[in-house]
Curated annotation (Swiss-Prot):
EC number of this enzyme: 2.7.1.39
Source organism phylogeny: Eukaryota, Fungi, Dikarya, Ascomycota, Taphrinomycotina
Gene for this chain: thr1
Matches recorded under PROSITE patterns: GHMP_KINASES_ATP (PS00627)
Organism: Schizosaccharomyces pombe (strain 972 / ATCC 24843)
Matching PANTHER family: HOMOSERINE KINASE, HOMOSERINE/4-DIPHOSPHOCYTIDYL-2-C-METHYL-D-ERYTHRITOL KINASE
GO cellular component terms, semicolon-separated: cytoplasm
GO molecular function: ATP binding; homoserine kinase activity
Protein name per Swiss-Prot or TrEMBL: Homoserine kinase
Amino acid sequence: MQKFQIKVPASSANIGPGFDVLGMSLEEYMTLDVEVSTESGPCVLTYEGDGKEHVSLDVQKNMITQTSLYVLRCNNISTFPYATKIHVINPIPLGRGMGSSGSAAIAGVMLANEIAKLGLSKLQMMDYVLMIERHPDNVMASMMGGFVGSFLRELSEEEKNAFSPSADDLLKNEALTLPPKSLGTFARLPWASELKAIVVIPEFHLATSKARSVLPTSYGRTDVVYNLQRLALLTTALGQTPINPHLVYEVMKDKVHQPYRASLIPGLQNILATLNPDTQPGLCGICLSGAGPTVLALATGNFDEIAHAMLSIFEKHGVKCRYLVLSPAFDGATVKYF
């Protein structure tokens, strides 16, 4: 019998003006404790953590094991080859903008890689992940670790056909081919050691599809230039020591998605308008985490005070929240054998 553990960090994407570009991993981990027998038998899945009452334990329906089966079928393996026990421990909030679905997809690909001894590198595994989760900013951060920028390359017409089925269709399809190679490219960006992330997590879910639906289909040049100018500076500003909080605060502003999503998150506009490095010493910048509703604040100190100021504003708008103070997970996703 083999025993191993897969750990996949949470992530925050759309950092500041970096919509669909910038992401960071966070030291809050989805963990899979796996036992693989040398004999054939069923795969048994158990789960504890956020959303337990809503998470399917059916291997054919759970996102982690569905993704594993997708990878196995791409490699001509129809099902889990050995009796497998998987216990998932997941503190990452579901549907809150902390990359829970991306972490699940990564965990599923890594699980298949270990069980079938496919020998895939992290970048090779990312090709499968990106077939399921097609926004690289959060999954690249979770897989590779740290603060990253990323993009999907342009595909040939043949590759577009392979990429065209939806993730749901891929997960249900029995006849599958290998994904296009080198789908995503990333670069690790500098990160000042004194910076930490305060994640304020509202007690309500916001589906990414709903958050996407409020965005415009096209943007004016002024708003695009506004974001591009700040994005260029942010990728350097977060790595400077000492941190310039007023610079970071300004270059974390956004006009591409936050103004449109603010109506879905009561209190967000007030937080963005009233909290700054002058009112909250130690605060460097604030933005939505992913599509929300979680709000991310970067700070060098006074973490609890900043968090409580944000919680107070949310409370005035009738929104209950909790918060975490987290560092980037620089190792990304890992596997450990026992």
